[in-house]
Amino acid sequence: MKVAGVDEAGRGPVIGPLVIGVAVIDEKNIERLRDIGVKDSKQLTPGQREKLFSKLIDILDDYYVLLVTPKEIDERHHSMNELEAEKFVVALNSLRIKPQKIYVDSADVDPKRFASLIKAGLKYEATVIAEHKADAKYEIVSAASIIAKVTRDREIEKLKQKYGEFGSGYPSDPRTKEWLEEYYKQYGDFPPIVRRTWETARKIEERFRKNQLTLDKFLK
């Protein structure tokens, strides 16, 4: 029986894409994931993740990566949880090899509801099991987590080559906030790599617009 794991990387940052990773393997080969040291990507260094990524590509029967742009995130008409479920479905339906069982790291406080959302969108029959911290419980979800994280890390490096050093991209990072302010101050807008609906970006935009209005009023 083929089993799949699904996880994401980059849900919280104000910069960069949300990345969905899907991994598929025959249930009898799960042991091979353990043998190479697959575990939750958050417990691994970037170097360890890169090494495991290469090994995973050889071991897995199939895998798929989906990038969700900041524009898609900003223009969504529903919650982040629903967007995530929707994109999980797109990724799962894009697999060459369809699994009979799917393990998902639940973004919803109600894992059963999250599983139902995914099952409803599948174009094939499969059992969907959604759990919190599934990436720490199931090796196949850990594999998906590693694929998503490595892909996002690579994307972030490409963005840094183009836009400069913006830190981790997380709202709590002082370097990220500094970069957002400097960029907006210089160009009067954010580049397409920024999630404009995130509070950090909105506050910067509001502050600069307010200052501009005050300046315009003064100059009149």
Swiss-Prot record:
The keyword Chloroplast does not apply. It is found in: Cytoplasm. A divalent metal cation binds at residues 7-8, 105. Its EC number is 3.1.26.4. Keywords: Cytoplasm, Endonuclease, Hydrolase, Manganese, Metal-binding, Nuclease. Manganese or magnesium. Binds 1 divalent metal ion per monomer in the absence of substrate. May bind a second metal ion after substrate binding. Residues 1-210 form the RNase H type-2 domain. One of its GO terms (molecular function) is RNA binding. Its main location: cytoplasm. The keyword Manganese applies. Belongs to the RNase HII family. Endonuclease that specifically degrades the RNA of RNA-DNA hybrids. This is Ribonuclease HII.
